[in-house]
């Protein structure tokens, strides 16, 4: 009986660390915000919604998965900034240049990033989950 329990424990621990498994990450880690900023810049390049650019406010959740490279999946609170689309190009957006617009629209987005650093490859897939009311805490 003891041998079976030891083997099951070993199998469970081994399976948790296998390639391809989804791992929850610390959403507050600075590396995630950097990746999210790059994704939101792409979101702004492909969108004409509103007069101002969107900026990330908070990484709500972060997950990773080892595939042919790394796949990162984020839920991100995004909000309207004070940076006008006509005055600031999407690739020039930064937290130093753009701050939150008072009363601006907020939304929750899913940002997926597939990276293969050895090939200098990064591909973003971005989708809006829902709008977020100003009074709603996330």
Located regions from the model:
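N- and C-terminal low-complexity/disordered segments
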Residues: 2-138
């Amino acid at each position: 009986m003891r041998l079976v329990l030891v083997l099951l424990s070993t199998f469970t621990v081994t399976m948790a660390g296998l390639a391809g498994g989804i791992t929850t990450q610390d959403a507050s880690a600075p590396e995630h915000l950097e990746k999210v900023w790059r994704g939101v810049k792409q979101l702004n390049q492909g969108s004409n919604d509103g007069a101002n650019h969107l900026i990330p406010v908070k990484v709500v959740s972060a997950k990773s998965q080892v595939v042919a490279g790394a796949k990162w999946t984020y839920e991100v609170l995004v909000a309207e900034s004070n940076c006008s689309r006509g005055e600031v190009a999407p690739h020039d957006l930064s937290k130093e240049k753009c701050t939150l617009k008072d009363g601006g629209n907020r939304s929750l987005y899913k940002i997926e990033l597939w990276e293969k650093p050895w090939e200098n490859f990064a591909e973003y897939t971005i989708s809006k989950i829902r709008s977020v009311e100003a009074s709603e805490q996330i």
